[in-house]
Amino acid sequence: MSESSGTAFGGRRAIPPNTSNAAENDPPTVELQGLVPRGFNPQDYLNVTNVHLFKERWDSNKVDHHTDKYSNDKLIVRRGQSFYIQIDFNRPYDPTRDLFRVEYVIGLYPQENKGTYIPVPLVSELQSGKWGAKVVMREDRSVRLSVQSSADCIVGKFRMYVAVWTPYGVIRTSRNPETDTYILFNPWCEEDAVYLEN
C-alpha cells in the first residue's frame, strides 16, 4: 500500500498533535451561542478593561515565589503555590449576576484533558494541589484574585485570558503578551514532584 500525500492525523485524532508549547493559536474573543438578538452589544455586559499581574521584582508574587532574581518582565510563578492578579472591569462586579473566569492556555491546540487549556474556576476556598481562584478583594470596579495552580501542571509560558459569560455566549479578552505567565517547578511545594526538604 502506498503512502498518501495528504496530511493524516492518525486514528481518531481530530487535530494534529502538539509538537511545541511555544507555538500559539488564540481562542476566539467572542463565542456566541444560539440565537442572538439584532441589537446585541457586547459592551452592555461586564467587560475587562485591564489586568494587573503584580510582576515587578519587588511585588509579592515574585518575592513569594523566589523568582525576583530573574531578569524577565513577565510574571514568573511556581506551580502549586498561590499568586495574585487584579482585574479591572467597566463597572462594579456583582457576583449575583456576573460570571467570569481566568483561563490559561499553552501550545498550538489547547485541550482541557491534556492540561494545555486550563479554565480556572472561582471558588470560595482554595484547595491544595488544584487550580482555583478566590476573590480576596472587591473595590469599586476592581477584583483581586488569589490564583492557585496545580502542583503537577505543565511547566512553561502560558497565555492568560479572562472570559466573561453573557446570556448569548462568552466574551474573552484579546491576546496580550503582557499577561503571559511563566509557571516553573516548585521545590518548596510538597505536592510537586521536585520537592526538596532542605
From Swiss-Prot:
The record's GO CC annotations read: cytoplasm; extracellular region
Tell me the disulfide pairings in this chain: none
PTM section of the record: The activation peptide is released by thrombin.
Cofactor comment in the record? Binds 1 Ca(2+) ion per subunit.
**Origin, by domain of life?**
Eukaryota
Region Disordered: what ranges? 1-36
- The entry's keywords: Acetylation, Acyltransferase, Blood coagulation, Calcium, Cytoplasm, Hemostasis, Secreted, Transferase, Zymogen
Annotated site (Cleavage): 38-39
Q: Which cofactor does it need?
A: Ca(2+)
* Major subcellular location class: cytoplasm
Catalysed transformations (reactions)? L-glutaminyl-[protein] + L-lysyl-[protein] = [protein]-L-lysyl-N(6)-5-L-glutamyl-[protein] + NH4(+)
Q: Would the keyword Cytoplasm be found if you checked this record's keyword annotation? A: yes
Function of this protein?
Factor XIII is activated by thrombin and calcium ion to a transglutaminase that catalyzes the formation of gamma-glutamyl-epsilon-lysine cross-links between fibrin chains, thus stabilizing the fibrin clot. Also cross-link alpha-2-plasmin inhibitor, or fibronectin, to the alpha chains of fibrin.
Q: How does it assemble?
A: Tetramer of two A chains (F13A1) and two B (F13B) chains.
| Xref: PANTHER family | COAGULATION FACTOR XIII A CHAIN, PROTEIN-GLUTAMINE GAMMA-GLUTAMYLTRANSFERASE
What protein name does the entry list? Coagulation factor XIII A chain
Gene of this entry: F13A1
